[in-house]
Amino acid sequence: MAYRESFYRYLMTQRDADSSDEVAQFANNAQHDLTFPKQEQDYEELSDYLELNASYLPSMSVFDRAYKMYEEKMMY
């Protein structure tokens, strides 16, 4: 099986402190979340964590968009 980076590692490539993009803001905030599951790849596990712990995420649709971008990147 090919190596697949974690969602967190991918998300960190989307950080941009000067951006108003919701995914960039999600990444900026996730960087400071000390309990974020940094090795996780699974959508359901990440979704469960974020629903319960990520008050910095304005909407789960932001996560959905970021995860779709992650999946597309991991296909190559």
Swiss-Prot record:
UniProt cross-references to Pfam families, sorted A to Z: YozE_SAM_like (PF06855)
Organism lineage: Bacteria, Bacillati, Bacillota, Bacilli, Lactobacillales
Protein name: UPF0346 protein LBA0976
Entry similarity comment: Belongs to the UPF0346 family.
InterPro entries noted in UniProt: UPF0346, YozE_SAM-like, YozE_SAM-like_sf
Domain of life assignment: Bacteria
Source organism: Lactobacillus acidophilus (strain ATCC 700396 / NCK56 / N2 / NCFM)
SUPFAM superfamilies xref list: YozE-like
